[in-house]
């Protein structure tokens, strides 16, 4: 394989270090341990190429993916000739190379939303200017950029006049305009198309892109070349698909915006126009594993845009181990190398049931011997499948155990994570009166609340103030002490009106809490100041562009709305406000590159909570790196550090840690030791509590790329799919004929891992390894 695709000196160094012995994919790949190291590999290869091509043409990505590429490139350039820099260079094939000069390179912008003002911080134009032109010291004069403000339109107008609602109707390319505005819009679309052709020509006039670095989307998109893009596509104005819009929602302030925003993107043929080009796709985390496998193991196909790199002898995928886990090479290595453990038996048998579409009891010894993985099981026999069945039954039995006399502390990175992960298990725990329960959300979660939601809520708050429906503000002591009292009453009032289906009173309950939050944040002393503050916040939000970072006080207000939502969910089960803890860890800032958790700022508050609650069981999200929002992963790091610190002063030998997952990433059956049956009633409780309580999330402004709707629907589908996998092994009759009603009524399953502290900290040590290479 590699004889056709010669590796550079840098690539040889990383390939040797990776320990990968076999590459059988259609495009070569290099694998590293973690996300920061992926940045190091990419930075080293980039600087190696620049040293050989000081006047070359480069195209680099935007978003979160290049965070460590940017940091490592800057680190190496700043430390090229000192001890720190030399050590890295000599280790990774840059030892003999002189420090590259970057100011003669030509930079090509990959893509941009359209229309979007170039002055907005969430435009890619702003990003590439900040991190690449200024950050790397590239030539602004040579750069080929996409500035939406400068693209000529009909009659010399600005896009805000031509497309006043920022929506571009591409059907005007083919149909007759219906009015004068549509005539101008049609002419403008033709002018944009002309501009895109000229942009493509400018790239080709300089010989095409020599070094392309890009990420890959959940649907496999490269730049904004989504699934189905023509292999010979060029720079164009185009629509995107739902998966791409869901990913872009975070940049643009919600799916309501991203679904209506077009993009200008270079094409797949633009990327491979120069046959000598180095074309690299980077992918981190297990959530990308499926699309990475399809992109690397499928022949050239418009369904998988990244397959276009097969045209380049210098085409590569750079992956973290997580992103490569589903590759046939990785699966072969998993089964063929190292000690055979029970997990391999379980996984291979369950996968064989899926592969053959057969129930477990119908799998014959001949089937096991014919499969390339199950045939490796030691002491393979007629009883092998039965042993796996018994193992899964034991996990289900554990999920049916009734826990008593426990102090439960359920934690989540964001509001709704706990509910979406293990609500059916929690309801079992809460129905036992000897158990005490606490809930804690570790970040403020403000980025999930849209400006529109806050504006609408504040408008309604003004309405109830004007109508005398917020009586609490009339009490003499409200602005001195009253605002801190009766928070449980807000919650009870809200839920009572969920029951009575009184939408007005429900909204009024939310506004009561918003008034309390405003008094706390803005230190309001009277009713007039309250009105002024509401008007001021509405004004700030109305004058913000979608996706703009909010001022700190508005961030806090959004966070406190989410905190109220969380209190509402657990109040369904009689949990009081004082048992719902809001930690607001400081690393969560809403910036594009968030900080790492800090021992004092982020770990200490968790330790203090542990001491205060003194739990016997702690639940947490056990998501691998890069499997979804990196907040999950960072909260896990901080929690692991807190457990370790707490263990220095208390005997934690009896403490149990529950590791769960939800909508961003899911467990496979072999990865867990507890399986909890989920009834239709459990699903209804989760769906109803989500719809009634997570008010800011019901419209799914920041959806999963897997579903255009509420996260609760995604969670329910995962539970149902998990049952399907286990039913294939155990048989449907196992469930509907079971002696326990809980199992007979199950139409979904929740998976989680129950660990002691030692097992959890061993997992945490693996996590620590995955941040080696952090700068």
Which residue stretches match the model-derived regions?
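N-terminal glycine-/serine-/threonine-rich phosphate-binding loop
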Residues: 1-58, 74-89, 96, 366, ...
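A conserved mid-domain beta-alpha-beta active-site/ligand-binding segment of alpha/beta enzyme cores
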Residues: 666-727
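ATP/nucleoside-binding phosphotransfer catalytic cores, i.e., glycine-rich phosphate-binding loops
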Residues: 2-8, 21, 33, 266-367
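Ligand-binding beta-strand-loop-alpha-helix segment within the catalytic cores
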Residues: 5-26, 87-210
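Active-site beta-strand->loop->alpha-helix modules in alpha/beta enzyme cores, enriched
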Residues: 169-186, 344-653, 659, 691-692, ...
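Gly/Ser/Thr-rich active-site loops/lids in small-molecule metabolic enzymes
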Residues: 224-254, 298-311, 641
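Histidine-anchored nucleotide/phosphate-binding helix
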Residues: 69-97, 418-440
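Glycine-rich anion-binding loop/nest that anchors nucleotide
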Residues: 57-61, 210-216, 252-296, 317-319, ...
């Amino acid at each position: 394989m590699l004889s056709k695709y010669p590796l550079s000196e840098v690539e040889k160094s990383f390939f040797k270090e990776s320990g990968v012995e076999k590459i059988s994919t259609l495009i070569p790949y290099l694998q590293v341990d973690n996300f920061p190291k992926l940045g190091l590999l990419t930075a080293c290869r980039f600087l190696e190429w620049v040293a050989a091509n000081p006047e070359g043409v480069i195209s680099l990505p935007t978003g979160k993916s290049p965070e460590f590429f940017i940091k490592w490139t800057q680190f190496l350039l700043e430390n090229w000739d000192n001890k720190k820099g030399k050590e890295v260079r000599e280790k990774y094939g840059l030892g003999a190379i002189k420090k590259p000069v970057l100011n003669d390179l030509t930079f090509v912008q990959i893509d941009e939303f359209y229309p979007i003002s170039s002055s907005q911080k969430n435009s890619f134009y702003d990003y590439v200017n900040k991190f690449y032109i200024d950050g790397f010291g590239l030539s602004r004069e040579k750069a080929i950029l996409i500035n939406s403000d400068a693209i000529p339109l009909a009659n010399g107008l600005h896009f805000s006049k031509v497309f006043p609602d920022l929506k571009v109707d591409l059907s005007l390319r083919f149909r007759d305009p219906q009015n004068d505005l549509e005539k101008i819009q049609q002419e403008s679309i033709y002018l944009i198309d002309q501009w895109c052709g000229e942009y493509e020509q400018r790239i080709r006039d300089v010989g095409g892109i020599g070094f392309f670095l890009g990420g890959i989307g959940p649907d496999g998109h490269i730049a904004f070349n989504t699934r189905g893009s023509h292999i010979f596509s060029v720079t164009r104005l185009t629509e995107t698909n739902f998966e791409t819009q869901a990913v872009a929602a975070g940049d643009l302030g919600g799916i309501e915006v991203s679904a209506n925003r077009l993009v200008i993107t270079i094409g797949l043929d633009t990327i491979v126009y120069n046959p000598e080009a180095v074309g690299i796709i980077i992918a981190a985390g297990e959530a990308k594993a499926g699309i990475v496998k399809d992109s690397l193991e499928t022949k050239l196909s418009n369904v998988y845009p990244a397959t276009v790199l097969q045209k380049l002898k210098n085409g590569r995928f750079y992956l973290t181990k997580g992103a490569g886990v589903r590759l046939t090479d990785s699966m072969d290595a998993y089964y063929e190398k190292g000690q055979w453990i029970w997990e391999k038996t379980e996984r291979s048998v369950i996968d064989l049931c899926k592969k053959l579409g057969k129930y477990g009891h119908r799998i014959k010894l001949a089937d096991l011997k014919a499969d390339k993985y199950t045939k490796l099981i030691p002491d393979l026999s007629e009883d092998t499948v039965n042993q796996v069945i018994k193992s899964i039954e034991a996990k289900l039995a554990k999920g049916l155990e009734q826990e008593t006399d426990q102090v439960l502390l359920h934690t989540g990175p964001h509001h709704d994570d706990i509910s979406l992960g293990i609500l059916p298990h929690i309801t079992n725990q809460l129905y036992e009166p000897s158990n005490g329960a606490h809930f804690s959300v570790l970040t403020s979660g403000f980025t999930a609340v849209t400006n529109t939601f806050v504006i609408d809520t504040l408008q309604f708050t003004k309405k109830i103030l004007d109508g005398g429906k917020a009586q609490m503000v009339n009490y003499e002591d409200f602005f001195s002490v009253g605002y801190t009292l009766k928070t449980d009453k807000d919650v009870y009032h809200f839920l009572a009106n969920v029951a009575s289906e009184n939408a007005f009173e429900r909204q009024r309950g939310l506004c009561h809490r918003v008034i309390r939050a405003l008094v706390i944040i803005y230190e309001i002393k009277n009713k007039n100041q309250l009105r002024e503050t509401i008007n001021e916040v509405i004004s700030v939000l109305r004058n913000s562009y979608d996706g703009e970072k909010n001022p700190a006080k508005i961030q806090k207000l959004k966070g406190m709305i989410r905190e109220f939502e969380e209190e509402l969910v657990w109040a369904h089960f009689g949990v009081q406000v004082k048992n719902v803890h809001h930690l607001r860890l400081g690393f969560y800032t809403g910036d594009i590159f968030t900080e790492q958790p800090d021992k004092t700022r982020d770990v200490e508050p968790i330790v203090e909570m542990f001491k205060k609650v003194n739990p016997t069981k702690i639940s947490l999200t056990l998501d691998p790196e890069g499997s979804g929002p990196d907040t999950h992963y960072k909260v896990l790091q901080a929690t692991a550090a807190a457990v370790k610190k707490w263990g220095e002063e208390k005997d934690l030998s009896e403490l149990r840690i529950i590791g769960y997952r939800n909508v961003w990433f899911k467990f496979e059956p072999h990865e867990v030791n507890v399986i909890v049956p989920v009834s239709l009633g459990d699903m209804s409780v989760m769906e109803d509590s989500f719809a009634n309580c997570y008010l800011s999330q019901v419209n799914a402004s920041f959806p999963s790329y897997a579903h255009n709707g509420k996260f609760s629907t995604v969670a329910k589908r995962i539970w149902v799919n998990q049952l399907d996998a286990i039913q294939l092994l155990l048989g449907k009759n196992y469930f509907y004929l079971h002696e326990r009603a809980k199992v007979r009524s199950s139409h979904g399953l929740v998976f989680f891992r129950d660990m002691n502290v030692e097992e959890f900290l061993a997992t945490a040590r693996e996590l620590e390894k995955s941040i080696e290479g952090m700068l």
